């Protein structure tokens, strides 16, 4: 079916017809505007193309979007649906339009996720419907047909992957629950050398990033019964090759050799080497600093190339294993020409958009810089995106920049060696679950997708927990000095004793040869074959474009990878367990639940709200902590409910409803959840599956019209198998008896994280999307997107196109998009000013002050917003009218699972999300969306704490 809507002006509304490709999507697509204007005062006017005949339906009620689309309660929706059934052929009107103006077909549908219905307001009045409709007109139409870049959407199309890798692997052919959950051991510290020892209280590491192979899919050493999962090896047709990854490990470690485990030389995980994906865990003690030499060792043979003295062909650089787009604002070590006015040759956006080089993948040495996410860290060690460095390779051209603009802020660090940077971490914050990952400007998504990431855990001395008033938590966790086998082999001295386990969840896709798949063209996001995306892209020498050729606005993959293994299984006792969960996906929001299944591999039955059916088959999560601390109360989380426990030994019978009946343990990218799971009372042989009921597309809230993840792939995450009838040796306190509190601001030990009572500044910050300023396109009947060379985006009326050289706005084509996702500064009403990475800094908190930041989300997606340096409290959310910027009468407080200290928060579409943070270290930091594809294309900007002199690059605008 075809439909779209946009606002032409205060007394005009125009609706038109455009294809809808997404299963379960609504009829309206904000990027679909084949326009035939109908003059009215916000009339509903749906124009149906039925051959050469048109049918118009008008009604004084607003256009039914979101939940009211197709079959909604309003008469207009029903009449629209009835008329839609009559439409069988649209070629008549399309041919007529094509004859009138060459190059124009139908409007392109590729907008946003359906379901921008505000998460905290499941019901709406008619007045609210009208306001919502007007808002959609302002933003360019109803949500409903954003394609979203899904591998699943390409399975029926021709191969869109790299030709040298072969076809993409169908995730449904991968056997599930035949590989063990790999529990990351603790990374060992470096041996102390006299020159580099530093203070004795400082934990010292030398951690390198190298290329190696990892067995992520079933096969190789996972076919070995030693892990206690398989009784006999899998047949050959259920095994897969290894995957080339980038990963971290101690620089002194040898090449992984898993030959004794049925693997091979060069294949991780291995007992002889701590190089692994994900990285082994870096354990830290509160108030004990940690010093890390981060080494870029991405060379041909890092095991033979001595990183301190690189010489010879073994030390030649390697190119990235993931396609890198050179047209973004990125590190640009090859110094492609940028805007001369900026006086920069690196860390900039190349300006010659017709240069064919910008359409090619970057093939030079790979830059890196590491960020400890959630760390209370000095700016020179925070992993600022312009503080990257290349490997000390022997064949890098002299024309390349070896380091980023700010690799040695303040001159405080000892970064005098190429290929290495020394970062120092205070660890002066409450015990928490942090993580570390790459943060290079414009290519974070590439580096993180390739593998380098790991847990960074802070504990109190003696293993205590900040904020635990009464009770004890499940343990033990993996201990320093234990290797892969001690941590992961079955037995009471191995994994069976562990009750605290970090779990990193990511989505990935693969070629049939086992290599990682990541899209190398924009057609992926449109779910088209590259030949069907017929528009100029950056790097086209004949036509100017502002659409990147390789970058995709979002990307969703079809294999769930947990701790570096596809769909693993973990055997548990009937006992209490503590899981430190991390959403490490690039774009995917997770909505996690626990479901008791029959063990046959069949999907977990769900009711219409996405709850396990029957309800007693769902196990609760007991969330005890968020990103930066324990919560003030244990929160029982079940699908549709989030109930704070009083801590007196009772679990309330009346549960507190969650923001949506479909909401379970919702986690945006980079959010963490510290949870307890109670397997006590479950019989031997019980199978508990961790499921994901989030969408396979960008998340905009729990709209019923948006489907949940594929039941055969991304809805399943991992399984827990109960293997004994009685628990063994765990004295953990049941969750209903635990008493927690937030870290006490009056405790002298917490002075560095004290929250001043006086708020000194309130900032309104905008979350935006931006369509092309150069390219107008239409969509043909087969879905192909075609350039309209005679049209240009109309700056007077955003979201529309006009004939070049004319003010006419009745053309069928529309601006192609999105070209970028942006941040901005809100004005007094609906005005906002976009801010780019290259712009002067406008956010300048004073040292030791507390500010309230309000994130106004004008876009169609939810965004996980991360602020470096600080912990913050989520204060409230409130809906706003995106036409008038008028706020709703009532705000809603943070949900119970957000009551602790956080560093990442979900900002929902059409809502203002309010947080409060204290800025206590001077210097240059960033804040950004943690959808990595957004972050890499302008949805990240710097901010500066303190005066302009506090750090290089703090060019603050008052």
Give the location of each predicted region.
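Cleavable N-terminal signal peptides of Sec/SRP-targeted secreted and luminal proteins
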Residues: 33-54
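Histidine- and aromatic-rich segments of cupredoxin/plastocyanin-like copper-binding domains
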Residues: 377-394, 505-512, 517-745
């Amino acid at each position: 079916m075809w439909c779209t809507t946009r606002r032409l002006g205060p007394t005009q509304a125009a609706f038109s017809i455009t294809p809808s490709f997404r299963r379960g999507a609504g009829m309206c697509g904000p990027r679909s505007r084949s326009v035939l204007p109908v003059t009215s005062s916000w009339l509903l006017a749906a124009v149906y193309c039925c051959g050469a005949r048109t049918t118009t339906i008008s009604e004084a009620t607003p256009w039914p979007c979101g939940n009211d689309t197709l079959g909604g309660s309003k008469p207009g929706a029903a009449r629209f649906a009835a008329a839609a059934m009559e439409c069988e052929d649209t070629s008549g009107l399309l041919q007529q339009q094509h004859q009138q103006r060459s190059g124009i077909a139908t409007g392109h549908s590729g907008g946003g996720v359906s379901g921008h219905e505000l998460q905290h307001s499941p019901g709406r009045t008619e007045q609210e419907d009208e306001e919502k409709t007007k808002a959609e007109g302002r933003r360019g139409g109803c949500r409903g047909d954003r394609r979203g870049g899904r591998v699943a959407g390409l399975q029926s199309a021709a191969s869109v992957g790299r030709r040298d890798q072969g076809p993409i692997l169908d995730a449904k052919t991968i056997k599930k629950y035949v590989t063990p959950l790999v529990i990351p051991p603790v990374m060992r510290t470096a041996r102390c050398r006299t020159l580099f020892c530093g203070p004795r209280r400082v934990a010292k590491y030398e951690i390198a990033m190298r290329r190696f192979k990892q067995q992520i899919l079933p096969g190789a050493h996972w076919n070995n019964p030693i892990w206690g999962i398989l009784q006999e090896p899998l047949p050959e047709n259920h095994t897969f090759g290894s995957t080339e990854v980038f990963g971290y490990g101690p620089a002194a470690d040898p090449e992984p050799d898993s030959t004794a485990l049925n693997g091979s030389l060069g294949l991780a995980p291995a007992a002889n080497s701590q190089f692994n994906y994900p990285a082994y865990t870096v354990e830290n003690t509160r108030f004990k600093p940690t010093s890390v030499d981060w080494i870029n060792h991405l060379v041909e043979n890092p095991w033979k190339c001595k990183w301190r003295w690189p010489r010879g062909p073994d030390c030649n650089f390697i190119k990235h294993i993931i396609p890198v787009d050179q047209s973004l604002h990125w590190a640009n070590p090859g110094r492609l020409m940028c805007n001369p006015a900026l006086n920069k040759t690196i860390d900039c956006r190349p300006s010659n958009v017709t240069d064919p080089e910008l359409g090619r993948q970057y093939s030079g040495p790979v830059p890196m810089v590491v960020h400890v996410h959630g760390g209370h860290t000095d700016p020179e060690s925070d992993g600022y995106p312009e503080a990257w460095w290349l490997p000390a390779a022997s064949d890098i051209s002299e024309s390349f920049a070896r380091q980023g603009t700010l690799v040695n802020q303040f001159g405080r660090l000892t970064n005098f060696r190429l290929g290495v940077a020394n970062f120092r971490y205070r660890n002066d914050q409450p015990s928490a679950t942090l993580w570390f990952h790459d943060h290079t400007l414009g290519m974070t998504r590439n580096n993180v997708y390739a593998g380098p990431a790991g847990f960074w855990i802070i504990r109190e001395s003696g293993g205590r927990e900040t904020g635990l008033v009464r009770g004890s938590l499940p343990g033990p966790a993996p201990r320093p000095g234990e290797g892969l086998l001690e941590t992961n082999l079955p037995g009471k001295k191995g994994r069976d004793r562990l009750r605290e386990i970090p779990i990193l969840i990511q989505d990935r896709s693969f070629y049939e040869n086992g290599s990682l798949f990541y899209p190398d063209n924009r057609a992926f996001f449109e779910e088209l074959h590259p030949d069907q995306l017929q528009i100029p892209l950056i790097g086209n020498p004949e036509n100017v474009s502002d659409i990147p050729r390789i970058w995709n606005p979002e990307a969703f993959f079809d294999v769930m990878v947990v701790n570096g293994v596809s769909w693993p299984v973990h055997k548990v006792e009937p006992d209490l367990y503590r899981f430190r969960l991390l959403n490490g996906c690039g774009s995917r929001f997770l909505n996690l639940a626990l479901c008791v299944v029959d063990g046959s591999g069949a999907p977990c039955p769900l009711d219409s709200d996405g709850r396990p059916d029957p309800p007693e088959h769902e196990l609760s999560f007991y969330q005890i902590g968020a990103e930066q601390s324990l919560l003030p109360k244990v929160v029982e989380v079940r699908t549709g409910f989030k109930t704070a426990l009083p801590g007196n030994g009772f679990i309330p019978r009346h549960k507190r409803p969650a923001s949506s009946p479909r909401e379970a343990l919702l986690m945006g990218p980079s959010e963490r959840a510290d949870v307890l799971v109670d397997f006590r009372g479950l019989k031997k042989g019980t199978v508990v599956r961790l499921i994901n009921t989030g969408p396979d597309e960008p998340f905009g809230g729990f709209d019923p019209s948006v489907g949940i993840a594929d039941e055969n792939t991304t809805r399943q995450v991992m399984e827990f198998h109960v293997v004994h009838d009685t628990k063994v040796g765990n004295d953990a306190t049941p969750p209903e008896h635990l008493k927690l509190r937030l870290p006490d601001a009056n405790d002298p030990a917490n002075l560095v994280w004290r929250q001043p009572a006086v708020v000194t500044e309130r900032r309104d910050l905008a979350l935006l999307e931006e369509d092309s300023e150069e390219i107008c396109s239409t969509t043909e009947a087969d879905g192909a997107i075609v350039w309209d060379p005679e049209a240009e985006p109309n700056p007077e009326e955003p979201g529309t196109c006009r004939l070049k050289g004319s003010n006419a706005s009745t053309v069928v084509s529309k601006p192609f998009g999105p070209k970028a996702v942006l941040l901005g500064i809100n004005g007094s009403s609906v005005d906002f000013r976009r801010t780019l990475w290259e712009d002067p800094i406008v956010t300048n908190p004073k040292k030791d002050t507390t500010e309230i930041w309000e994130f106004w989300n004008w876009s169609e997606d939810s965004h996980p917003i991360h602020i470096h340096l600080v912990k913050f409290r989520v204060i409230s959310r409130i809906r706003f009218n995106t036409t008038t910027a008028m706020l709703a009468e009532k705000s809603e407080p943070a949900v119970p699972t957000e009551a602790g200290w956080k560093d990442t928060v979900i900002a929902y579409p059409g809502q203002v999300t309010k947080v409060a943070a204290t800025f206590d270290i001077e210097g240059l930091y960033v804040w950004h969306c943690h959808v990595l594809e957004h972050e890499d294309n302008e949805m990240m900007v710097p901010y500066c704490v303190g005066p302009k002199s506090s750090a290089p690059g703090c060019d603050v605008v008052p």
